[in-house]
């Protein structure tokens, strides 16, 4: 017979352990590496760096009216520009970058113009840019009949929109608004003799770096700091 009533025997209950949750991975997978393009593989990056050098030169000449420009090429990881002007301090880089950001926000078009060497000389003399005159003379010595290429920012000469120009073969972006200002940084100041000639004036060289994205800039800066250790 089956026991019943209040005196019936009871079967003790057993606690059942809940299944263990799978252990979380101890280490999250590393983020994918940031692709760092080169000038050779990215014409867009090359244009960004070249145009940024022009924007920097325009900013410097706006802040220091008597500054004279020389050359401003792109280099492996950025650009530089040499100026004949009073010595700069590191704090001046912030002023220049702030002015550059304003120029970028204005979305000034970059316009190409071909002129004769005689017309280029006239404009350079009018602008009182002696170093550009030396550069022009070098071009004429190599090829007396070569047309001279100028790049203008804002508009063509003689128009109210014209802001700045340089003796330059390009290439450039279509307008300054295409420059990613959060991927641009001014890095350092150095002295450099014009043409490497110690008998010539000591120029102020501003080095900068420019990339396509802020992530690339951050990675570049991380690698620079890592190399210092």
In which residue ranges do the predicted regions lie?
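N-terminal chloroplast transit peptides
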Residues: 1-2
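Auxiliary tRNA-acceptor-end handling modules of aminoacyl-tRNA synthetases
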Residues: 16-23, 27-48, 59, 68-71, ...
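Short, glycine-/polar-rich solvent-exposed loops and beta-turns at beta-strand/coil boundaries
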Residues: 73-75
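Metal-associated gating/positioning segment near the N- to mid-region
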Residues: 62
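Short hydrophobic alpha-helical segments enriched in small aliphatic residues
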Residues: 5-8
């Amino acid at each position: 017979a089956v026991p019943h009533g209040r005196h019936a025997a009871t079967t003790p209950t057993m606690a059942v352990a809940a299944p263990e949750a799978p252990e979380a991975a101890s280490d999250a997978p590393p983020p994918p590496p940031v692709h760092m393009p080169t000038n050779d593989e990215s014409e867009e990056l090359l244009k960004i760096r070249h145009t940024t050098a022009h924007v920097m030169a325009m900013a410097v000449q706006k802040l220091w009216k008597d500054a004279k420009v020389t050359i401003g090429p792109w280099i492996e990881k950025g650009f530089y520009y040499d100026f004949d002007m009073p010595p700069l301090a590191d704090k001046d880089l912030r002023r220049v970058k702030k002015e550059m950001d304003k120029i970028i926000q204005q979305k000034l078009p970059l316009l190409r113009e071909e002129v004769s060497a005689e017309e280029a000389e006239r404009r350079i003399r009018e602008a009182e840019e002696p170093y550009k005159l030396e550069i022009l003379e070098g071009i004429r010595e190599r090829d007396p009949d070569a047309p001279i290429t100028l790049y203008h920012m804002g508009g063509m000469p003689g128009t109210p929109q014209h802001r700045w120009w340089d003796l330059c073969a390009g290439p450039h972006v279509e307008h300054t608004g295409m420059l990613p200002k959060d991927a641009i940084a001014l890095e350092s100041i150095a002295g450099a003799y014009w043409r490497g000639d110690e008998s010539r004036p000591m120029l102020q060289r501003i080095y900068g770096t420019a990339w396509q994205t802020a992530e690339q800039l951050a990675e570049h800066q991380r690698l620079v700091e890592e190399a210092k250790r």
